[in-house]
Amino acid sequence: VAGCELAMAMAFALRAAGVKPRITVIELGPEISGVSRQARHRILLAMDGLGIVIKTSARVIEVRADQLLLDGDSPVAANLCVGAAGGLAHTWIAKTDLPQRDGFIEIGADLGVVGDKALFAVGDCAVMPHALRPKAGVFAVRAAPILHYNLRAALSGNERKTWRPQKHYLKLISLGGQSAIAEKFGF
């Protein structure tokens, strides 16, 4: 959904500057992911209203100065390419001996790295296998007070607190101008 937000923001800004852009969003999956059916419908309507084309089930195989080459499809002309791939594992993590799951540092409920009481990790570099959540900034922000407490506890020898990440959170998805849709609990 981040690529859609970026496309709509750029379309809005360019139109405000008097430019009529041709924008194409290329989505690897069969549809925009990470949102409910209702939100997806509203996003697609907003993109259509801004003249943004979306190509789904499309794989970019090469980025050139003036076009994107797609696997099994015609090239897409481009003056500017912007990538938005979501939360991906950092390559440096794979080069460490830290415990990992799918390239993310494995942490426990106290935000400590599994097997090492002196290390902590939160945010997009970490994963809590017992409480899997999407990669969204809200979780790192909400973990901060527990991380702060547990860092102090680790230094003083006190007991650590457990963090329980919320299951539902508010998503605000910009539609390109001064409007957005809100989604929580799948609506």
Protein language model annotation of sequence segments:
Residues 3-4:
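N-terminal Rossmann-fold NAD(P) dinucleotide-binding loop
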Residues 8-58:
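Rossmann-like dinucleotide-binding cores of NAD(P)H-dependent redox enzymes
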Residues 24-26, 55, 82, 120-122, ...:
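Hydrophobic/aromatic beta-strand patches that form the interior of the parallel beta-sheet core
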Residues 28, 124, 177:
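Cofactor-binding loop segments of dinucleotide-utilizing enzymes, especially the Rossmann-like FAD-
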Residues 56-67:
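A conserved short coil-to-beta-strand element within the FAD-binding core of flavoproteins
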Residues 60, 71-74:
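A structured beta-alpha segment of the ubiquitous adenosine-cofactor-binding alpha/beta core
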Residues 67, 75-142, 149:
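FAD-site-proximal beta/loop scaffold in flavoenzymes
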Residues 146-187:
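C-terminal, flexible cofactor-proximal segment of oxidoreductases
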